């Protein structure tokens, strides 16, 4: 590749990293808006921690775990201890590290909202460190790190079993479903907020304090997704990359608007009025769903994925809240977990190059099913050990009095609103 091409690709990758980083304030505003004002400083602090811890730990160790040479039979990569010389890609390693770091921070941040309003800040620090250091880099090594789930050698497990490899272009499974599964396990370990469920098991609504803030957060996340998905092409020079990036931009936006539209009309039909809060999550559901196959599906396929995710989201939130009695204040387990899984599976059906619905057989769909199963079982197992281990050893939840009065003053000694 010539110098101009490498320079253009590098600039595009760094610009995309900036957009993905901008998703952090999007998550912060969205989560804060969907929760009560007495916990806003705590929500914002946790989002800063995810970014700070994620950046440091991924630089020193996680980057090597994810992209280093295979050890332990390919289960994990060789830790780098802050040394970046092992990386052999064409693009500058520093730029690639930054791009991958903001993805790691995104996966960590997803859990914050599901565990909002009742988690000890000190124990959240432990979780944030473990996902950035261990959980995310290991499953990332199996996939984007060139590991066994994406090994296309003829004699590899995936090729010999399914005739295809697992595909997740920008992270429906690797980033979002992992965060969503961890969010669900964390919410289960914590238990519901005080007053969320009556003695008879009826779910009581606990409204967030600022839907305007949440709306702004979703718009910022939507913008950030234009770095998250198109940026995963990791190149912009040449006709192939120009076309690929443009296609991913289009499919990403179509899925977002389809998801939001489906949720808006469904809530209008079910509840008599279109719900703003659920429509916001519907947009995110479409974005999460398209992230795995935004490079492979057609524009019509993107609309279908968005519509399905926007509809399923509503029923997933109801089921988790009303039937399972799991208190997820922002719906993270439904948006990122359920829709991340759904989008990955639908990629296996709707991919124009090897999808089952395009006459290419069921091998690729099988690879997608197996990949998402392995990745989310890993996340669930780690989440159970981590959250229930913390709960047993140190306690995961604040005292009832602190929860009722708000975490801002007791955990941080200050409030966002005076």
What are these regions (language model features)?
Residues 1-418:
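Glycine- and aromatic-enriched membrane alpha-helices
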């Amino acid at each position: 590749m010539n110098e101009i091409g490498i320079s253009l690709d590098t600039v595009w990758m760094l610009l995309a990293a900036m957009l993905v980083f901008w998703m952090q304030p999007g998550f912060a505003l969205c989560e804060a808006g969907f929760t009560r004002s007495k916990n806003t400083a705590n929500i914002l602090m946790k989002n800063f921690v995810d970014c700070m811890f994620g950046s440091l730990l991924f630089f020193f160790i996680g980057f090597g775990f994810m992209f280093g040479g295979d050890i332990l039979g390919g289960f994990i990569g060789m830790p780098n201890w802050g040394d970046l010389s092992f990386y052999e890609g064409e693009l500058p390693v520093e730029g690639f590290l930054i791009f991958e770091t903001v993805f790691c921070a995104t996966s960590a941040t997803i859990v914050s909202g599901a565990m909002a309003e009742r988690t000890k800040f000190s124990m959240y620090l432990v979780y944030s460190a473990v996902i950035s250091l261990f959980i995310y880099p290991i499953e990332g090594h199996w996939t984007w790190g060139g590991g066994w789930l994406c090994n296309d050698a003829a004699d590899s497990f995936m090729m010999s079993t399914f005739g295809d490899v697992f595909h997740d272009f920008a992270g429906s499974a690797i980033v979002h479903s992992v965060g969503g599964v961890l969010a669900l396990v964390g919410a289960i370990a914590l238990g519901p907020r005080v007053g969320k469920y009556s003695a008879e098991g009826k779910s009581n609504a606990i409204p967030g304090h600022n839907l305007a803030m949440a709306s702004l957060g979703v718009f910022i996340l939507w913008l950030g997704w234009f770095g998250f998905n198109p940026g995963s092409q990791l190149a912009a020079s040449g006709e192939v990359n120009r076309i690929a990036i443009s296609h991913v931009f289009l499919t990403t936006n179509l899925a977002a608007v389809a998801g939001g539209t489906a949720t808006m009309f469904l809530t209008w039909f079910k509840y008599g009025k279109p719900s703003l809060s659920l429509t916001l999550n519907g947009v995110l559901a479409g974005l999460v769903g398209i992230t795995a196959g935004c490079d492979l599906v057609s524009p019509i396929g993107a609309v279908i994925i968005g519509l399905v995710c926007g509809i399923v989201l509503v029923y997933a939130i109801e089921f988790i809240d009303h039937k399972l009695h799991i208190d997820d204040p922002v719906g993270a387990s439904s948006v990122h977990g359920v829709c991340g899984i759904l989008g990955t599976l639908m990629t296996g059906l709707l991919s124009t190059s090897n999808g089952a619905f395009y006459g290419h057989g069921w091998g690729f769909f099988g690879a997608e099913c197996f990949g998402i199963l392995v990745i989310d079982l890993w996340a669930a197992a780690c989440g159970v050990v981590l959250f229930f281990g913390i709960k047993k050893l140190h306690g995961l939840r604040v005292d009832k009095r602190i929860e009722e009065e708000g975490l801002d003053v007791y955990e941080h000694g200050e409030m966002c609103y005076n």
